[in-house]
Design a protein with these regions (language model features):
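Short loop/turn segments at secondary-structure transitions that flank enzyme active sites
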Residues: 65-67, 90-92, 111-113, 185, ...
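Hydrophobic, aromatic-lined core segments that form the binding pocket/scaffold
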Residues: 148-396, 409
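Compact, glycine/acidic-enriched structural inserts
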Residues: 82, 86-144
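N-terminal ordered "arm"
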Residues: 7-66, 79
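N-terminal "leader" segments that precede or initiate the main folded domain
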Residues: 1-6
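Cysteine-cluster motifs in flexible loop/terminal segments that predominantly coordinate metals
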Residues: 395-424
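N-terminal accessory interaction module
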Residues: 44, 54-55, 60, 66-98, ...
Length: 424
């Protein structure tokens, strides 16, 4: 209820009857103020006329007036600058810390707004606002998707910053860890990130010129060289090499091989293949992050990250069992997903870190130039009448689903705002 009161106040969706305080003084809302997302009153710098006198200050909203006391505002001088207490139910008078009476307004939510809000909250259909999407003005759609895209960029930049802190601000390491996670393509994403974060990068770097030794490091630390398969010569060689590297660098125990999931995976996405591709890439590109950040075009980046494998994996998806010869290269779709989920967020985050707008703009341009992702979220929105053309669109819709639709947070959504206005 309080969220709905916030919405009605913020957008000045008032009934036609004049507003007045519970003591009968007329109220004119010139500016409802700025929503405060931190501690303190709910709206800052509101501009109101109460009984003909202009007031500028803060506004606090509650479902019930008595919430003022439950929250301790009557003992908190921070709330002494509240010029109006807006409530859904006026069950008592409220007071400042100095004992003065706080002007109070009983705000009624229009029935049609409440009904539409209940529709959005209770429907099982996704997206809940499907009935208005096709009729929304293009400018409304474009501006909201653009804002969501920036919001998603900023969230991913924060996640990268958190990884940087854990990795002593080593951009190359964090880029590789994020790349590894995204090569898990969802099902094995957590396992790949945990494995990559567990890698002794400086030890691996000492043997980076040898693809065989990098593979031994990667597969061994992934817990995939723990069994005794005498019949596979390449496996035995990798295992022997890994045991040598373990002793040389006093490596910590590998992650558990049980972390890796194979069910419902296409063989090309098996962990062994992805680890072999990462090993090849780590061996080939000794300054991977730096090269990617310096690349001018998306096609140049694809050439840099276009990984293959050592010859053994051209006839294997796992150890022991051979398969028909096939080069295990990253396909076009996989490269696009790596661009969308790894490279482009890093361009943006690195641009923010260096205050380099050129990198941030490049990230946006790359995203707008790539085709939209084809997944269940984009298909649902497209089916509801919202065109999805570029990766910028699809990333914005993923943000919308995660941060708004799944949380039923329609009051902060611009599509939800249009729905509540009655555009049906």
């Amino acid at each position: 209820m309080e969220q709905l009161l916030h919405y009605v106040w913020k957008h000045k969706i008032f009934l036609l009857m004049p507003l007045q305080t519970t003591s009968g003084q007329p109220v004119e809302v010139i500016d409802p103020g700025l929503l405060n997302t931190d501690a303190g009153p709910d709206f800052f710098n509101a501009k109101l006329k109460i009984n003909g006198t202009l007031w500028v200050g803060n506004v606090e909203l509650h479902t019930q007036a008595s919430d003022w006391f439950r929250h301790g505002h009557n003992r908190d001088t921070v709330y002494d600058n509240v010029i109006l207490h807006v409530v859904g139910e006026s069950d008592c008078e409220v007071y400042y810390a100095n004992g003065g009476i706080v002007p109070q307004l009983l705000l009624h939510c229009p029935d049609n707004v409440r009904q539409r809000y209940d529709e959005l909250r209770q429907t099982e259909i996704y997206p809940p606002c499907y009935s208005i999407l096709a009729s929304l003005p293009k400018l409304t759609v474009h501006s909201w998707l653009s804002a969501l895209q920036v919001e998603r960029f900023e969230q991913k930049a924060q996640a990268i910053a958190a990884r940087l802190e854990r990795c002593n601000n080593h951009w190359e390491d964090v880029f590789f860890i994020t790349l590894a996670r995204n090569l898990g393509f969802g099902l094995n994403g957590d396992a790949f990130e945990a494995w990559a974060a567990h890698l002794p990068f400086r030890a691996v770097d000492k043997h980076r010129d040898s693809l065989f030794q990098v593979e031994a490091f990667f597969l061994g630390q992934a817990g995939l060289l723990e069994e005794d398969w005498q019949e596979d010569c390449y496996y035995r060689e990798l295992q022997k090499e890994f045991h040598y590297l373990q002793r040389k660098f006093e490596l910590s125990a590998p992650v558990s091989g049980d972390w890796w999931r194979f069910l419902r995976l296409r063989p090309g996405n098996f962990p062994h293949v992805r680890l072999a591709q990462l090993a090849w890439l780590y061996h080939k590109e000794q300054s991977l992050f730096s090269r990617v950040m310096a690349a001018e075009t998306a096609e140049d980046i694809k050439k840099i990250i276009s990984a293959r494998t050592s010859p053994y994996w051209e006839t294997h998806f796992t150890f022991k069992k051979s398969s028909p010869h096939q080069e295990k290269r990253l396909g076009e779709n996989a490269l696009n997903l790596i661009l969308i989920n790894t490279v482009i967020p890093f361009l943006y985050a690195y641009g923010m870190h260096r205050a380099d707008e050129r990198l941030c703009d490049r990230a946006t341009c790359f995203l707008e130039a790539l085709k939209a992702e084809n997944n269940h979220v984009t298909r649902l929105w497209s089916g509801a009448g919202l065109p999805v053309y570029t990766a910028a669109d699809s990333q914005a819709l993923l943000q919308l689903q995660k941060e708004y639709c799944d949380r039923k947070d329609c009051l902060r959504c611009r599509f939800g705002y249009e729905y509540l206005r009655g555009k049906k």
